[in-house]
């Protein structure tokens, strides 16, 4: 009966890593280039929870690139006035990344976390909205692009003021406390309970 301890370990590991325990992080990928009309208009909003990731994919080209030249950017986190004017100036403008290699695949990731051990990391507060803009480099054909990141959840009753698309598109599907846990979590709990009642574990 050496398989029973192994079965117990596998079940508990699956349970502890499941969304019911908050062990599942979501990733939202944004292709940061001027072919994205929502980034151009400034109405792109992403809702993420703590421990989720925002992945920014820089513009990249196969071959010579567009006739007007490749897009290259410096991406900043700014306050609301900087977002509205698309200006990365002042003490509340933080340079986050530089997309300067248009002929190679470059991707940056921002972990949405309350506390960070890194000196250059950023700490996010639930219920707050953060603003990202990109400023084209002088030789770039790019334009100002803007994105809002809303960090869930200050209060469970408050809803997002902006649509974020379908759950698969926005990267916000998954269990957030208060909603129904996933069927996998319920199945694992039921299996653990049955095995415990049968005194197998």
Swiss-Prot record:
Protein known as: Ephrin-A4
Record-stated family: Belongs to the ephrin family.
UniProt entry keywords in alphabetical sequence: Cell membrane, Disulfide bond, Glycoprotein, GPI-anchor, Lipoprotein, Membrane, Secreted, Signal
InterPro entries: Cupredoxin, Ephrin, Ephrin-A_Ecto, Ephrin_CS, Ephrin_RBD
Lipid-attached positions, GPI-anchor amidated serine: 170
Maturation propeptide residues: 171-201
Keyword ATP-binding among record annotations: no
Tagged with keyword Oxidoreductase: no
Gene Ontology process terms (BP): axon guidance; cell-cell signaling; ephrin receptor signaling pathway
GO cellular component terms, A-Z: extracellular region; plasma membrane; side of membrane
GO MF annotation, one: transmembrane-ephrin receptor activity
Cystine crosslinks: 58-99, 86-144
Glycosylation (residues): 33
Taxonomic lineage from the root: Eukaryota, Metazoa, Chordata, Craniata, Vertebrata
């Amino acid at each position: 009966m050496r398989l029973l301890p192994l079965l117990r370990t596998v079940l508990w590991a699956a349970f502890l890593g499941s969304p019911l325990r908050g062990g599942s992080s979501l990733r939202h990928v944004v292709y940061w280039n001027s072919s994205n009309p929502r980034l151009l208009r400034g109405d792109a909003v992403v809702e993420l929870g703590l421990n989720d990731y925002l992945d920014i994919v820089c513009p990249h080209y196969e071959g010579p690139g567009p006739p007007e030249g490749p897009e290259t950017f410096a991406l900043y986190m700014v306050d609301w006035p900087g977002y509205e004017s698309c200006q990365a100036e002042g003490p509340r403008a933080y340079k986050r990344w530089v997309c300067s290699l248009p002929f190679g695949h470059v991707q940056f990731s921002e972990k949405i976390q309350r506390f960070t051990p890194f000196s250059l990391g950023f700490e996010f507060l639930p219920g707050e909205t953060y603003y990202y803009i990109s400023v084209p480099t002088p030789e770039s054909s790019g334009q100002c692009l803007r994105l809002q990141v809303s960090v869930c959840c200050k209060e469970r009753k408050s809803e997002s003021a902006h649509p974020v698309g379908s759950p698969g598109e926005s990267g916000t599907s998954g269990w957030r406390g208060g909603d129904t846990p996933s069927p996998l979590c319920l199945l694992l709990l039921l299996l653990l309970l049955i095995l415990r009642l049968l005194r197998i574990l």
